[in-house]
């Protein structure tokens, strides 16, 4: 949700790219549709990191049913001291349309304790498509993703306000050099179009190397 940092280390390391991340436990914060393209039936993770002398704690996970339906949830805090912490809860459902495309729905609730204190609610729609390619003995894939966030978002309390609505789209290419080694190249562009004061464009690019010994 608006105002609380994404706790996924992979997302931060990849330039803030969320729409085309591959399946992991933090899919609820990025793109829950991605979880349906992973090998694992379920994943759970927890983490913490410090940003600007403030600490974020988080926990998230998902579970797949029949490899076609996915339920995901996540919780995070953004800390000032032990008593003053912004908190959020995120829930998501994703459905796999076919071998290539999956869609997701998200709902977010956040409790802010800063100068603009109050409760924030919003919803989102996500999509991801994975197109596989054969390269001789090796496998590669093109991932395309999109995400509309902040739908119906508002912050109640003394400083009632609408939350930013943004659309993001990205692409990633997975290049599997062998069964153990892989490279991922990704890029994403995000446009915030409402309200006018928050309007703007931002983007990110990233590269990831993966080593699998299992």
What do these predicted ranges mean?
Residues 1-214:
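Subset of outer-membrane beta-barrel
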């Amino acid at each position: 949700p608006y105002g609380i940092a994404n706790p996924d280390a992979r997302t931060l390391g990849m330039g803030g790219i969320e729409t085309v991340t591959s399946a992991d436990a933090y899919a609820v914060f990025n793109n829950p549709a991605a979880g349906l393209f992973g090998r694992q039936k379920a994943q759970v993770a927890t983490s913490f990191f410090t940003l600007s002398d403030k600490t974020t704690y988080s926990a998230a996970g998902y579970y797949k049913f029949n490899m076609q339906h996915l339920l995901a949830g996540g919780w995070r805090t953004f800390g000032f001291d032990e008593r003053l912490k912004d908190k959020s809860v995120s829930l998501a459902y994703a459905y796999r349309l076919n071998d290539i495309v999956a869609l997701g729905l998200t709902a977010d609730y956040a409790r802010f304790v800063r100068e603009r204190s109050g409760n924030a609610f919003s919803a989102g729609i996500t999509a991801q498509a994975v197109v596989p390619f054969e390269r001789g003995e090796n496998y590669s894939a093109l991932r395309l993703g999109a995400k509309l966030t902040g739908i119906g978002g508002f912050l109640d309390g003394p400083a009632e306000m609408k939350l930013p609505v943004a659309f993001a789209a990205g692409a990633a290419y997975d290049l599997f050099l062998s069964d153990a080694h892989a490279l991922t190249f990704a890029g994403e562009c995000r446009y915030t179009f409402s309200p006018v004061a928050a309007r703007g464009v931002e983007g990110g690019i990233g590269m990831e190397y993966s080593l699998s010994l299992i």
